[in-house]
Amino acid sequence: MPKLHLISLGCNKNLVDSEIMLGRLQNYDITDDISDADVIIVNTCGFIKSAKEESIQTILEMHEARKNGSLLVVTGCLMQRYKDELIKELPEVDLFTGVADYDKIDEIILKKQNLFSPETYLQANEERVITGSNYHAYIKISEGCNQKCSFCAIPTFKGKLKSRSLENITNEVKNLVKKGYYDFSFLSQDSSSYMRDQGINDGLINLIDEIEKINGVRSARILYLYPSTTSKELISRIIASPIFHNYFDMPIQHISENMLKIMKRGSGAKKIKELLNLMRNAQNSFLRTGVIVGHPGESEEDFEELCEFLEEFKFDRISAFAYSKEEDTASFEMEQIPAKIISKRLSKIEKITKKAINESLQKELGKQIYASLEGISSEGEMFYAAKKDIWDKDIDGEILINESDVKELEIGSLYLCEVSDVVDQKLVATIIKKAK
């Protein structure tokens, strides 16, 4: 069989697209050896400057390492956003495609022709090859975005919001449950807008209702809630759910009224704080957010207000980003803040972030928690790795398992564990017994 090497860069929404391509290319053997691959696919990210640079660097590295006669295929957001420039500037690449044709990747390779269909690909009933887990899967619920954030170019190359049908989503989950998957993360650019393109404002509540009816779904969470489209009713429905964890991932980007207006976030600080307090007051809640520092217009007062809020509110996880000046955005034409100031602000925010994460982890000491066994840890074979049941896979942390009262451990199974230590932002725990 011919051999395939695929690299998926950027977010987990990109990973889903990569898994769809793998589903179309099941006549290939997957190889980790680039020099042995007959086809190499790079699924790129084009969101911010650092992601674009990583994508270009990866493409060039793949070209350097590949064997004669192999095909180098580049797809994804970077290609969609800069297709004309990159086709001219990357002679190393054999085939180009964007964000519209993941389900046609086999035809593109067979015909050896570039393809850029006009509409962003919206997943229907295509079979995916899930990677990196035998129990957890990401489920994409929509494509595109109708928001108008001043810093974000995603709507310019991903298009307007397009929601998958409830039937498509539930069928995918049912099929994955049959294969042994029991833990799901539902995601999109703006998950709380799900079905609003079809005139339904509580689409996410409807989705929760339907997922709860599926036997075999043990746990779930929703990623990328957007403040202006997140309702108190939605939060209450998540809290009431026996399946969906009280996991709230809502990037606020800022908390200063001035900055929320400049960033065109669509909701003020008062509403954001009301939503966050509802989330925090839920039993065993877990709150994740994201912020941007150095956006044009951010004064020292705005920045200090953000710092104070992050220190006071005690998020469990915070992702902090330096503002990236992007073409085709409202903030591109604004007066920019000097890079030195942005770097200094980011450094301060990162210290707050680290402290918040450590405090969240320290709360787990001595507790008994449920966690899924992942395999060998990032620290090597001395430890197994596990994921706490409420956490999202990969982004919320790793539990190091150093001892077990259970002799025969099964990768992907859920275990009751006791947390004994926190080391380098990782929990250390002992497995007590297998969950029922």
Curated annotation (Swiss-Prot):
The cofactors named for this UniProt entry are: [4Fe-4S] cluster
Q: Which InterPro entries match?
A: Elp3/MiaA/NifB-like_rSAM, Methylthiotransferase, Methylthiotransferase_CS, Methylthiotransferase_N, Methylthiotransferase_N_sf, Ribosomal_uS12_MeSTrfase_RimO, rSAM, rSAM_horseshoe
- PANTHER family in the record, alphabetically? RIBOSOMAL PROTEIN S12 METHYLTHIOTRANSFERASE RIMO, RIBOSOMAL PROTEIN US12 METHYLTHIOTRANSFERASE RIMO
Q: Which GO terms describe its cellular component?
A: cytosol
Record-stated family:
Belongs to the methylthiotransferase family. RimO subfamily.
Binding residue positions for [4Fe-4S] cluster 1: C11, C45, C77
One GO biological-process annotation of the entry reads:
tRNA modification
What job does this protein perform?
A: Catalyzes the methylthiolation of an aspartic acid residue of ribosomal protein uS12.
Which residues participate in [4Fe-4S] cluster 2 binding? C145, C149, C152
**What's the top EC group for this one?**
transferase
Location(s), subcellular: Cytoplasm
- The name of this protein is Ribosomal protein uS12 methylthiotransferase RimO
Alphabetized, the UniProt keywords read:
4Fe-4S, Cytoplasm, Iron, Iron-sulfur, Metal-binding, S-adenosyl-L-methionine, Transferase
GO molecular function per UniProt? 4 iron, 4 sulfur cluster binding; aspartic acid methylthiotransferase activity; metal ion binding; protein methylthiotransferase activity
Q: What is the lineage of its organism?
A: Bacteria, Pseudomonadati, Campylobacterota, Epsilonproteobacteria, Campylobacterales
Q: Which transformation does this protein catalyse, written as a reaction? A: L-aspartate(89)-[ribosomal protein uS12]-hydrogen + (sulfur carrier)-SH + AH2 + 2 S-adenosyl-L-methionine = 3-methylsulfanyl-L-aspartate(89)-[ribosomal protein uS12]-hydrogen + (sulfur carrier)-H + 5'-deoxyadenosine + L-methionine + A + S-adenosyl-L-homocysteine + 2 H(+)
What does the record give as EC number?
Answer: 2.8.4.4
This protein's record includes keyword Coiled coil: no
Please report the stretch or stretches of sequence annotated as the MTTase N-terminal domain: 2-114
Q: Domain Radical SAM core, which positions?
A: 131-368
Bound cofactor: record note: Binds 2 [4Fe-4S] clusters. One cluster is coordinated with 3 cysteines and an exchangeable S-adenosyl-L-methionine.
Its domain of life reads Bacteria
